[in-house]
């Protein structure tokens, strides 16, 4: 009887862990529910600082962006929703540059070659950190619901998490969050 219960429990765990995952051309991704959250100024968690290396070999440190709004997108070349949202993020990065908003990517689980091909194919011109070990994802998951790919975090000028989109972003969801955060300067 105990072994039957163990098998049922293991099956339920597999279903729970795979629920929300998507399948695209045989490549999996960790799907979110496309929810968005905006945090009031007094209720924002401090974003964890990180240091990493960009896909082109340049050092990147989040703290060096203090004083600017930062959009940090967690993505992978293997992720179909990441491919779908990439062109929108590229457009937004150009549109909000004059408003002092910087965009960064956190490439999770890719080789540098695959990640560079992704950014080239999608037209992403902003830097991305190679996070093959998922260490930045793990640090952010301690303070926000970062555990799905894609997830996009908006960090205010003081380094606090002002907004979060779990799953694929839309142009409207991001402009709403960015207009709110940039207006509160």
Language model: regions and residue ranges:
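A short beta-strand-turn-helix
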Residues: 41-44, 49-70
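Thiol/disulfide oxidoreductase modules built on the thioredoxin-like
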Residues: 117-125, 131-185
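Hydrophobic beta-strand anchors of alpha/beta hydrolase catalytic cores
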Residues: 71-72, 103
């Amino acid at each position: 009887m105990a072994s039957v219960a163990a098998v049922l429990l293991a099956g339920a765990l597999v279903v729970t862990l795979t629920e929300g995952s998507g399948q695209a051309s045989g490549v999996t991704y960790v799907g979110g529910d496309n929810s968005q959250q905006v945090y009031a100024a007094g209720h924002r968690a401090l974003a964890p600082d990180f240091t990493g290396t960009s896909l082109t070999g340049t050092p990147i440190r989040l703290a060096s962006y203090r004083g600017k709004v930062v959009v940090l997108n967690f993505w992978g070349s293997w992720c179909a929703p990441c491919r779908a949202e990439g062109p929108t993020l590229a457009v937004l990065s150009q549109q909000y540059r004059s408003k002092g908003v910087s965009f960064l990517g956190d490439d999770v689980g890719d080789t540098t070659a695959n990640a560079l091909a992704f950014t080239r194919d999608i037209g992403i011109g902003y830097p991305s950190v190679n996070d093959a070990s998922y260490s930045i994802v793990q640090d952010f998951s301690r303070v926000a619901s970062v555990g799905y790919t894609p997830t996009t975090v908006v960090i205010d000028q003081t380094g606090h998490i002002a907004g979060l989109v779990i799953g694929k972003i839309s142009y409207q969801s991001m402009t709403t969050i960015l207009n709110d955060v940039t207006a509160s300067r």
